[in-house]
């Protein structure tokens, strides 16, 4: 008996007739079997009595005893290949609404459909119908084109709302549910990169709805490349991929919400609990009008499906490898995709966990998902409907049922196929042998759509749509709020990182006691050279601390970002959710640094505290924005410190502590591009150490003659002992004037700059880095 329901497992239950009685046994199904509304224990025979009801999925069977027939045929209880929905006619209606909400004329109960999604309206002047999108999250499409305004409808136009297809017939509609009936066809895929290297060689596949497909092969065979090409996330540059006979590459946005993709690395934050991770994913992926109750129910359903309910409150990093992979799958199942692609989902799992994962994927396929899995493990490959074997270089060596693969290759174990593919023939020879085989005819040619069947004439490959093409999803502000909450929650959970962020400023502040002492800015006993070096050190420290704090913020979650970006994520709210947290840390760190300056050097005085605080905060923020840029361009977290070091070198050399006169025009130009130059010069002017020198340009008033000893307040100009005669006074004056002249020649440009203008430059640097971060992330969309 075949029950066509996605909640029914592939082998769900068994009925046995023994000694005049019927006995039912649940075969370890995913969603269980109920007898008289009570779930029976799996793998334990349960006797049935006349009148008992058996509930499996949405089907309820009632036992009625009748005379035993001599033969029982196989019974097929199924819905059509595409489930046709009952929809009202347009006749006599001025408008008809489509959406998830119960008050719509056509109710589509799917998580990716908005509450009020679209409306069909009759025009008063000619009676024709138009369709308009009602601000839905995932868009309304007509014949594959996004509806951006009122659009006239014509006979046989196909309207797509989520996974539902509505065909317009004047005065009538025909609606079909494709959510659990998505087929995938690949037609002569080739992926040419670099200098003509082809990673996929003329691969053609025909995958039917609800099939579980494994893609296996030797290392370097192009398994992940094939998966990416089939999913459309990194398209092949020759050939086509069809979803229900519609070109995926040129209609990517049409099927975007129906594609689930789980990369090799987990796409979840390890610091969150299972429920929190799925809840944040649901907030970002589900329509903006999804209520908290609906969101909670969707998360709960996914937890139940993946058998994660018992560990929903556990932190993900404390789960086993298999459980972590299930959470990653759960993030994709929230959108209830019809196609699910998994890259090495069983990699690194122990045999028991690997077997459980394969059974889980088998059950998901039985529930209506078409699943493609890249894997090295072949132990449980018999659970798959079809298996793809790739030879080295992207050659298709076999596609068909796993049970037939052993005979096809003439081996006794699946692992032996790897040796055959690498030893007996060239990859091209294996591909040619398969094209001449019965399996190729039966499982490729005959299963392809009729127009691509035996004749196999393909049209010119169409233009490829960019998977990052824009669609209006959740508003930028809403995404910013969700991401900010998630970042705060991650920090709260990751106590070690949060503690380090809070301690880095006071720990570095302790170093101030090593190079700072009270009175270095005073005319009596001060030291102008030391003051300059101290102020420069503080500028460098602020920039470095900012960079260290943020240099891994983006790259550490690159896989999560990449997946969320494909689905819903906007770049600006994502970056700003990082920036404002960095701003809070900058405000805190600047305050801590000023506290330690006060303790170590009794500086700055009260009237300079605010200006110094603003300068330090801006410098920290400029460093943090630079760190975010480093994080955005780094290929992996290990590269980030090296890039920060590369940027720090010119900040130190050309930032101002070495006099400008030692540099040529190139060095001076580099100096203008550094953050430390503008921070350092601001600090020098704010300190007032050279104010009297800047005011006395001609050295005729405060800073010349005897006035330099008694009126000028330049640090360290006054002798330790009062001159006792005219000769000592002249010597003291000469020393003071020489000191001032030397300092003025080397750093005089910093004695009286426009602090507000320098703050403006620091803000400009921050804005520039923000732009570079956004540009870097946009550039990654094209890869």
Regions found by a protein language model. Give the residues of each.
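Forkhead-associated
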Residues: 1-58, 88-163
């Amino acid at each position: 008996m075949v029950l066509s329901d996605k909640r029914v497992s592939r082998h769900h239950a068994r009925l046995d007739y023994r000694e005049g009685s019927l006995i039912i046994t649940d075969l370890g199904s995913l969603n269980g079997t109920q007898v008289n509304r009570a779930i029976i224990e799996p793998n334990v025979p349960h006797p049935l009595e006349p009148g008992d009801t058996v509930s499996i999925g949405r089907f309820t069977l009632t036992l009625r005893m009748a005379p035993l027939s001599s033969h029982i045929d196989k019974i097929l209880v199924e819905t059509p290949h595409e489930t046709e929905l009952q929809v009202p006619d347009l006749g006599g209606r001025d408008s008809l609404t489509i959406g998830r909400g119960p008050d719509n004329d056509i109710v589509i109960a799917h998580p990716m459909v908005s509450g009020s999604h679209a409306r069909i309206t009759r025009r008063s002047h000619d009676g024709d119908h138009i369709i308009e999108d009602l601000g839905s999250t995932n868009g309304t499409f007509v014949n594959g084109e996004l509806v951006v305004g009122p659009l006239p409808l014509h006979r046989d136009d196909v309207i797509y709302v989520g996974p539902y297809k509505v065909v317009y017939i004047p005065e009538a509609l025909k609606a079909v549910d494709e959510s659990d009936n998505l087929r995938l066809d690949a037609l002569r895929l080739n992926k040419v990169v670099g200098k003509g290297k082809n990673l996929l060689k003329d691969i053609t596949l025909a995958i039917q709805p609800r099939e579980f497909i494994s893609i296996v092969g030797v290392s370097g065979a192009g398994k992940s490349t094939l998966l990416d090409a089939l999913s459309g996330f990194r398209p092949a540059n020759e050939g086509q991929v069809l979803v229900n006979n519609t070109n995926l590459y040129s209609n990517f946005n049409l099927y975007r919400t129906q594609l689930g993709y789980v990369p090799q690395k987990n796409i979840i934050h390890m610091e969150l609990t299972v429920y929190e991770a799925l809840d944040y994913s649901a907030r970002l992926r589900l329509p903006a009008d999804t209520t908290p109750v609906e969101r909670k129910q969707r998360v709960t359903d996914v937890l139940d499906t993946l058998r994660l309910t018992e560990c929903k409150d556990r932190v993900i990093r404390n789960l086993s490898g298999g459980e972590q992979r299930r959470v990653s799958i759960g993030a994709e199942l929230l959108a209830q995709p019809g196609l699910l692609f998994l890259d090495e989902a069983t990699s690194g799992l122990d045999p028991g966990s690997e077997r459980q994962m394969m059974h889980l994927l088998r059950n998901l396929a039985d529930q209506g998902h078409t699943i493609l899995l890249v894997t090295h493990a072949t132990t449980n490959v018999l659970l798959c409907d079809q298996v793809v074997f790739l030879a080295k270089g992207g050659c298709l060596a076999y596609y068909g049922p796993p049970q037939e693969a052993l005979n096809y290759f003439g081996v006794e174990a699946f692992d032996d196929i790897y040796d055959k593919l690498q030893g007996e023939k060239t990859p091209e020879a294996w591909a040619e042998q398969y094209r001449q085989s019965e399996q190729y005819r039966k499982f490729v040619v005959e299963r392809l759509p009729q127009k691509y069947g035996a004749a196999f004439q393909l049209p010119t490959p169409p233009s490829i749509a960019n998977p990052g093409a824009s669609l209006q999803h959740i508003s930028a502000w809403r995404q910013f709020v969700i991401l900010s909450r998630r970042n705060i929650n991650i920090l709260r959970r990751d106590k070690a990182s949060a503690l380090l962020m809070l301690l880095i400023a006071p720990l570095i502040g302790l170093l101030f006691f090593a190079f700072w002492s009270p009175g270095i800015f005073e005319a009596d006993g001060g030291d102008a050279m030391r003051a300059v070096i101290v102020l420069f050190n503080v500028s460098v420290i602020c920039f470095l601390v900012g960079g260290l704090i943020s240099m891994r913020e983006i790259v550490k979650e690159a896989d999560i970002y990449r997946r969320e970006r494909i689905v819903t994520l906007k770049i600006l709210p994502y970056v700003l959710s990082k920036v404002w947290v960095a701003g809070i840390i900058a405000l805190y760190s600047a305050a801590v640094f000023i506290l330690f300056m006060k303790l170590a050097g009794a500086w700055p005085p009260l009237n300079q505290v605010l200006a110094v605080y603003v300068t330090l905060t801006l410098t920290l923020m400029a460093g943090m924005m630079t760190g975010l840029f480093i994080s955005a361009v780094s290929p992996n977290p290990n590269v980030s410190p090296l890039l920060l070091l590369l940027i720090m070198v010119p900040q130190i050399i050309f930032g101002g502590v070495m006099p400008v006169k030692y540099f040529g025009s190139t060095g001076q130009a580099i100096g203008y591009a550094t953050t430390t130059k503008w921070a350092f010069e601001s600090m020098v002017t704010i300190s007032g150490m050279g104010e009297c020198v800047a005011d006395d340009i001609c050295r005729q008033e405060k800073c010349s003659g005897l006035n330099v000893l008694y009126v000028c307040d330049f640090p360290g100009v006054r002798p330790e002992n009062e001159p006792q005669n005219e000769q000592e006074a002249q010597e003291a004056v000469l020393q003071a004037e020489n000191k001032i002249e030397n300092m003025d020649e080397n750093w005089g440009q910093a004695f009286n700059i426009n602090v507000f203008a320098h703050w403006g430059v620091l803000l400009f640097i921050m804005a520039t880095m923000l732009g570079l971060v956004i540009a870097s992330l946009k550039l990654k969309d094209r890869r």
